[in-house]
Regions:
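Extracytoplasmic/secreted envelope proteins and their assembly/folding machinery
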Residues: 44, 48-51, 79-84, 96, ...
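Extracytoplasmic "Venus flytrap"
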Residues: 27-48, 70-77, 103
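Extracytoplasmic ligand/sensor domains, especially the bilobed periplasmic-binding protein
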Residues: 88, 93-144
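Short beta-strand elements in bilobed, periplasmic/extracellular small-molecule ligand-binding domains
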Residues: 60-75, 136-140
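Short, well-structured alpha-helical segments in soluble
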Residues: 69, 76-97
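Signal peptide-proximal N-terminal region
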Residues: 44-67, 91-94
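Sec-dependent signal peptide recognition
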Residues: 2-11
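Sec/Tat signal peptide C-region and signal peptidase I cleavage site
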Residues: 18-22
Length: 144
């Protein structure tokens, strides 16, 4: 299901991506070390499989997808600085079209507004936090 959802999200992120980009940048924010490492690696693996499949078929309308992975260690401070890096303090060419994550709920409320303000689609594949609902932030989709 995540694979199909990712394909749909990538399609819509492509529709709204600025024309100046030569590729779509997709960020994955997940714990890649520590207590939740296994889950983070599985999330990254699933996204990588979908991206590889899309790229092997020529990308989306000829645009390849760049996958950028960030280990947030389930630390909300790292997630916030990552959001700033991916959404605010970056050129239009390097800005993310889509961000998947974070895995851990503790950072979700702090970063959702950053991505929404930057117009970046965000998929939350695992968070069960009730502090944020899909309608509260433009471009936020919770899978759980």
């Amino acid at each position: 299901m995540l694979k199909n959802s990712l394909k749909i999200a990538l399609f819509f992120s492509f529709l709204f991506a600025p024309n100046a980009r030569s590729a779509l940048n997709i960020g994955v924010i997940a714990p890649l070390a520590g207590e939740y490492q296994k889950v983070g690696e599985e999330l990254v693996s699933g996204v990588r499989t979908a991206v590889d499949e899309i790229n092997s078929q020529g990308g989306l309308k000829g645009e390849k997808i760049n996958l950028i992975m960030v280990d947030d260690q389930c630390d909300d401070r790292i997630a916030v600085s990552t959001a700033q890096m991916m959404a605010v303090n970056v050129s239009e060419r390097d800005k993310m079209s889509l961000v998947i994550g974070p895995y851990c709920s503790n950072a979700l409320q702090k970063i959702a507004g950053i991505y929404a303000k930057a117009g970046i689609l965000q998929i939350i594949p695992t968070s069960v936090s009730t502090s944020i609902q899909n309608g509260n932030y433009k471009g936020l989709v919770k899978m759980v």
